[in-house]
Amino acid sequence: MAPNIRKSHPLLKMINNSLIDLPAPSNISAWWNFGSLLAMCLATQILTGLLLAMHYTADTTLAFSSVAHTCRNVQYGWLIRNLHANGASFFFICIFLHIGRGLYYGSYLYKETWNTGVILLLTLMATAFVGYVLPWGQMSFGGATVITNLFSAIPYIGQALVEWAWGGFSVDNPTLTRFFALHFLLPFVIAGITIIHLIFLHESGSNNPLGISSNSDKIPFHPYYSLKDILGLTLMLTPLLTLALFSPNLLGDPENFTPANPLVTPPHIKPEWYFLFAYAILRSIPNKLGGVLALAASVLILLLIPFLHKSKQRTMTFRPLSQTLFWLLVANLLVLTWVGSQPVEHPFIIIGQMASFSYFTILLILFPMTSTLENKMFNH
């Protein structure tokens, strides 16, 4: 038999073992599509981002007009920008669903894969934040000032740290320049960590909805899951294109159509929708350092999830009590997202505080307790 280059060539062999002949569980559902969708999001964002960077000027006097110029005068510049801005939203939708899938089906028990995933989430959040500053609109400036200022809550070194990050005594030209450098660099860092994420995943193989070993029943990735991934891609690209073409500014803030002015503060500084849940947790603590710690904890708590798994079963498929708790957590996050978009006044303050408290309570206390209870129930 003639040697197959796909299986013998050093580079093609790696691609083959990762994307073609990879043995995959036969029963993984559409919830397992989001990994490949995230890869597609990253590819799209890097491509559109490169095209935008070719027309962008990282200078406080020119940034806003260079973005306007891209939209007005560059061939399809408006489309590239709208795809890039809304592509970020879809990136976050996919990553939230991907994390939710991991929580529900106990995928976090692959600790290395889970931890690299959390690092990817943090890097993505950093990338989105520095990217939002680049158009240099009012909300870009306000957001940059507020969020970088949070570092000043760190005892002793805080103030020095903030001024070091700013490159001066306020958010100014050096800040914009370094944010552009970071926004250009970080997506490639994400691509690198993604490869590590995949290496760890392929050490164990995929989990499945039943949470049991699938070694006895594997199917090749191609054509089954390659085709399924293409279907997932079309189902994601359709709403993305619809949003970018019909309502490109739906998720944006009108304040960002005004060029940045350090002398005027927007009435309500709020981040993009995908940060609102964390922003609500930050605001619900009436102390700067406490708020910053809660903000960090809201995402870093994911690192604790594997250690809080007390159930004898891996997935929640056959655990109705944990399922109820899971959907309560989802509803709780939606409430936090909504509260984060509202002004700081009654009743939103108390709603935010209650939602923040219940967020941590569900994850740290109720999940382990419920799992232990279910274990006892299964024994009878």
UniProtKB/Swiss-Prot annotation:
User: Can you tell me which residues bind a ubiquinone?
Assistant: H202
Q: What is its main location?
A: mitochondrion
Which residues hold heme b b566?
H98, H197
The prosthetic group or cofactor this protein requires is: heme b
Q: Where are the transmembrane segments?
A: 34-54, 78-99, 114-134, 179-199, 227-247, 289-309, 321-341, 348-368
Provide the GO MF annotations for this entry. Answer: metal ion binding; ubiquinol-cytochrome-c reductase activity
Task: Provide GO CC annotations from the record.
Answer: mitochondrial inner membrane; respiratory chain complex III
Which InterPro entries does the entry mention? Cyt_b/b6_C, Cyt_b/b6_C_sf, Cyt_b/b6_N, Cytb/b6-like_sf, Cytochrome_b, Cytochrome_b_C_euk/bac, Cytochrome_b_N_euk/bac, Di-haem_cyt_TM
Q: Could you tell me the keywords of this UniProt record?
A: Electron transport, Heme, Iron, Membrane, Metal-binding, Mitochondrion, Mitochondrion inner membrane, Respiratory chain, Transmembrane, Transmembrane helix, Transport, Ubiquinone
The protein's location, in the record's own words, is: Mitochondrion inner membrane
Describe the protein's quaternary organization and the partners it interacts with: The cytochrome bc1 complex contains 11 subunits: 3 respiratory subunits (MT-CYB, CYC1 and UQCRFS1), 2 core proteins (UQCRC1 and UQCRC2) and 6 low-molecular weight proteins (UQCRH/QCR6, UQCRB/QCR7, UQCRQ/QCR8, UQCR10/QCR9, UQCR11/QCR10 and a cleavage product of UQCRFS1). This cytochrome bc1 complex then forms a dimer.
Record protein name field: Cytochrome b
Species of origin reads Tragopan temminckii (Temminck's tragopan)
